[in-house]
């Protein structure tokens, strides 16, 4: 086996262990924020939505800068620094008794993510061969789901005793992850050339097709982020106990572990990436619309199952499509910019979702936020369909001219 092949094989295992620690550390804390501050402390959902949206926007919106810096200086220093900053943010959350302190903790957490997330994504693109990426992203999603439910179960158990225990466990896991990267991650370059920061960012901004695709995905993310805000609140309201939230993540884990890889393997043989992304988004959108009308936990979990199935279909295709569109000369910059859709969609989804949830509750129209999210998903579906049809038309024109 050549040294390159050996490095790729070892890199896969490194990426899987690193991903497990990151997801565990995140899901021990974040799914319980809305339960802690909305249900236990009585804050308005929009206040918590601002905090979650701030974290999302900072982490993903500034991702292009983190990616461009990583293109210049390498992945290792960015990842280690970002992990430690995320740990500090989670620790601060444990003493948040005023909204501004929660916002500050989410700001720290987001800045940490800005540093470590783009280079980690770029390492996947660097180490995994193009024909294997779809399956590897599926494996990562399966691991995400299993780690998420373990993290949520651990966090829910700790919440029974003290929220500060929740906010101590998350930082410990991120410090462990920082040490793991500092010890084992080689000083790899992310791009084929050492790209100056400004050049990497400029290269991305000139790629109009990639920019349009990323910005359109904001609508997709408005729906996706509700697993952190409105869906846990809804499950808690219907069940009458925060412990029911862990079953929501258990459903996701079961579906991902049993369906994700088989669906990905089958669909990649029969459907284009664009079609898989759009089909998943359509299922997610349609499953959102009736959520506000249900009153039983069984009905709610059925809709959540449909939502997760849509995500299982869409997410590996979205990741693979984003990676395939990235320029190898500026991988970090591309993968950083690819998070901008999540920054915009996540911020609007959290803040707007929280505001609509409060508005629907006060107006006795609980279906309002869910119908709006479903409509946004349908419009995003149509916009993506138009973009992909334009791309196919341009390809046919080039083939005819040739």
From Swiss-Prot:
PROSITE patterns per record: MFS (PS50850)
An example Gene Ontology CC term for this record: plasma membrane
UniProt superkingdom: Bacteria
Name of this chain's protein: Multidrug resistance protein MdtH
Membrane topology: Multi-pass membrane protein
Keyword Cytoplasm: no
Family per similarity comment: Belongs to the major facilitator superfamily. DHA1 family. MdtH (TC 2.A.1.2.21) subfamily.
């Amino acid at each position: 086996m050549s040294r390159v092949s050996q490095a790729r094989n070892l890199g896969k295992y490194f990426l899987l262990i690193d991903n497990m620690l990151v997801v565990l550390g995140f899901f021990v804390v974040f799914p319980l924020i809305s339960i802690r501050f909305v249900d236990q402390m009585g804050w308005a959902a929009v206040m918590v939505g601002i905090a979650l949206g701030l974290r999302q926007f900072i982490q993903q919106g500034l991702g292009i800068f983190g990616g461009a810096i990583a293109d210049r200086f390498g992945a290792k220093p960015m990842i280690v620094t970002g992990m430690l900053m995320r740990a500090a943010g989670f620790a601060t959350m444990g003493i948040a008794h005023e909204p501004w302190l929660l916002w500050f903790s989410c700001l720290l957490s987001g800045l940490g993510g800005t540093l470590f997330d783009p280079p980690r994504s770029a390492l996947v693109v660097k180490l995994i061969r193009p024909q294997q990426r779809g399956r590897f992203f599926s494996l990562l999603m399966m691991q995400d789901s299993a780690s998420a439910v373990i993290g949520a179960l651990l966090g829910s158990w700790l919440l029974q005793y003290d929220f500060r225990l929740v906010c101590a466990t998350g930082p410990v896991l991120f410090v462990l992850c920082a040490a793991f990267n500092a010890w084992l991650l080689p000083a790899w370059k992310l791009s084929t050339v050492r790209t100056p920061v400004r050049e990497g960012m400029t290269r991305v901004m000139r790629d109009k097709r990639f920019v349009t695709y990323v910005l359109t995905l904001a609508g997709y993310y408005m729906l996706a982020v509700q697993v952190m805000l409105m869906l846990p609140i809804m499950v808690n309201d219907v069940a009458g106990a925060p412990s029911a939230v862990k079953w929501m993540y258990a459903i996701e884990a079961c579906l991902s572990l049993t369906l994700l890889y088989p669906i990905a393997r089958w669909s990649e043989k029969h459907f284009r990436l664009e079609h898989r992304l759009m089909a998943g988004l359509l299922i997610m959108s349609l499953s959102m619309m009736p959520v506000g009308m249900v009153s039983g936990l069984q009905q709610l979990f059925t809709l959540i199952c449909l939502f997760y199935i849509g995500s299982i279909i869409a997410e590996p295709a979205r990741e693979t499509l984003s990676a395939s569109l990235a320029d190898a000369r500026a991988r970090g910059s591309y993968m950083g910019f690819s998070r901008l859709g999540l920054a915009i969609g996540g911020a609007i989804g959290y803040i707007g979702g929280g505001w609509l949830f409060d508005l629907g509750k006060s107006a006795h129209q609980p279906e309002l936020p869910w119908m709006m999210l479903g409509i946004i998903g349908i419009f995003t579906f149509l916009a993506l369909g138009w973009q992909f049809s334009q791309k196919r038309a341009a390809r046919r024109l080039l083939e005819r001219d040739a």
